[in-house]
Regions:
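Catalytic centers of hydrolytic enzymes
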Residues: 1-196
Length: 196
């Protein structure tokens, strides 16, 4: 099964499913946020080496677990999906950087890009059947770049300044590339991951 990071902008893909799986499994968080990679290529099916992981995920990011309210999670996703502009013909233009896009794992949600900003995201519930409550506080797995204010999504979601975001960190884990390498060393199949 091929891994193509740019497909993340179009919905579920192997790349986002892999990162969500790794982040949720390592952290035990309720929700996972992941973003596209700058990698412009595909890791083809077959044996995956550490070099493939460096190509697919070139960033030095540590996995963080942070706390966000349900309302902040919706605001975060609203900000992430704000990179999509209106449709021109049958194509939707990007009005923001794809690097400032995140998608969520661990929850079922709809993103209606034809709705106005602030009304695009509807969270239906958790993958495990739990209900999502905007007033509850949840644990969210994300990379250190985002947790420390990269792309400003955390600041816009919480209303905090970058230097205040440390108050939201619950725990820090290993480098994401190491976690990906561990996944492939375990012999897990991407196909089985896609089926779950």
């Amino acid at each position: 099964m091929d891994i193509d990071p740019k497909l993340i902008l179009f919905g579920d893909c192997t790349y986002s499913n892999l990162l969500h799986h790794v982040q949720l499994k390592e952290s035990g968080a309720d929700i996972s946020f992941v973003s596209p990679s700058k990698f412009r290529g595909t890791v083809t099916a077959g044996e995956v080496t550490y070099n493939h992981i460096l190509q697919m995920y070139p960033f030095e990011n540590v996995l963080y677990k942070v706390k966000l309210s349900g309302r902040e999670i919706i605001t975060y996703l609203e900000e992430a999906y704000s990179i999509f502009g209106p449709k021109v013909g049958n194509q939707r233009k990007l009005i923001g950087s794809p690097q400032n896009f995140d998608c969520a794992g661990g929850i079922r949600y709809e993103a209606d890009l034809d709705k106005p900003a602030g009304k695009r995201i509807k969270i239906l519930g958790f993958n495990d059947g739990r209900k999502f409550n905007i007033d509850s506080v949840y644990s969210v797995a994300m990379v250190s770049y985002r947790a420390n204010g990269g792309g400003e999504l955390m600041m816009k979601a919480t209303g905090l300044q970058a230097e205040e975001l440390g108050s939201r960190v619950i725990e820090k884990y290993s480098d994401v590339r190491e976690l990906l390498f561990k996944f492939f060393l375990s012999g897990r199949s991407l196909k089985k991951l896609e089926e779950n």
